[in-house]
């Protein structure tokens, strides 16, 4: 399966903002973007004339990298969002937020989406009482994500209560760190997505 091989901190510098790809490290003095907030490479500091297409492309790349999704799947999500009722850009972000690996991350069971994806692939969680290992699975209203007793000693999961208390979780989710369980109590809304993204630029890019 294809995957990103570029250093994660270089991705943040390339996109010009923190993508929070390395979990807690992004909140410390070790964050590469805080130390060098400019594009990587010899000409990273140089001022460049940016075209409309380049702005749209960067917005798409930034969003893909935040969720760790490759182009083919991301475009598939856009097609699906465009076929739904409502605003296409908002539909796209809601689809991305409803991915199981993102929900695991949002609930505080992982320090990053990449880590959440690995945990899901290893079958660490159950969805409505059944073992799942598909990171892209779309959660639904009322779904319950839980860590079985035998998996609760995994270090990152043992810290779940602390992470949930420190980071919290979105209003559309309910996390119970003591029970190693989370519930989807509503569908995500645009206001629940806090990272800086202009989804309309993505729509304009794909509509050309």
Curated annotation (Swiss-Prot):
Any GO BP: ribosomal small subunit biogenesis
Assembly with partners or alone: Part of the 30S ribosomal subunit. Contacts protein S5. The interaction surface between S4 and S5 is involved in control of translational fidelity.
SUPFAM superfamilies: Alpha-L RNA-binding motif
Family: Belongs to the universal ribosomal protein uS4 family.
Gene Ontology CC: small ribosomal subunit
UniProt xrefs under CDD domains: S4
InterPro entries (alphabetical): Ribosomal_uS4, Ribosomal_uS4_bac-type, Ribosomal_uS4_CS, Ribosomal_uS4_N, S4_RNA-bd, S4_RNA-bd_sf
Keywords, sorted A to Z: Ribonucleoprotein, Ribosomal protein, RNA-binding, rRNA-binding
Chain ranges of the S4 RNA-binding domain: 98-161
Naturally occurring in which organism (per UniProt): Desulfovibrio desulfuricans (strain ATCC 27774 / DSM 6949 / MB)
A Gene Ontology molecular function term of the record: structural constituent of ribosome
Name this polypeptide is given: Small ribosomal subunit protein uS4
Organism lineage string: Bacteria, Pseudomonadati, Thermodesulfobacteriota, Desulfovibrionia, Desulfovibrionales
PROSITE patterns: RIBOSOMAL_S4, S4
The protein's role, per its UniProt record: One of the primary rRNA binding proteins, it binds directly to 16S rRNA where it nucleates assembly of the body of the 30S subunit.
């Amino acid at each position: 399966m294809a995957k990103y091989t570029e250093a994660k901190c270089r991705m943040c510098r390339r996109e010009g903002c923190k993508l929070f790809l390395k979990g807690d490290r992004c909140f410390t003095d070790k964050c590469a973007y805080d130390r060098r907030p400019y594009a990587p490479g010899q000409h990273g500091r140089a001022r460049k004339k940016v075209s409309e297409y380049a702005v749209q492309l960067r917005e798409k790349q930034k969003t893909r990298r935040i969720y760790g999704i490759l182009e083919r799947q991301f475009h598939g999500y856009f097609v699906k969002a465009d076929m739904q009722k409502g605003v296409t850009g908002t539909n796209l972000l809601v689809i991305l937020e409803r991915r199981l690996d993102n929900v695991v991350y949002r609930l505080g069971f992982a320090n990053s989406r990449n880590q959440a994806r690995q945990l899901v692939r290893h079958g660490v969680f159950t969805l409505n009482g059944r073992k799942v290992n598909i990171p892209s699975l779309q959660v639904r209203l009322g779904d319950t994500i839980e860590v079985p007793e035998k998996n609760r000693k995994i270090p990152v999961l043992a810290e779940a209560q602390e992470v949930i208390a420190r980071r919290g979780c979105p209003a559309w989710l309910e996390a119970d760190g003591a029970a190693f369980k989370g519930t989807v109590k509503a569908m995500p809304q645009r206001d629940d997505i806090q990272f800086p993204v202009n989804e309309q630029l993505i729509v304009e890019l794909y509509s050309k």
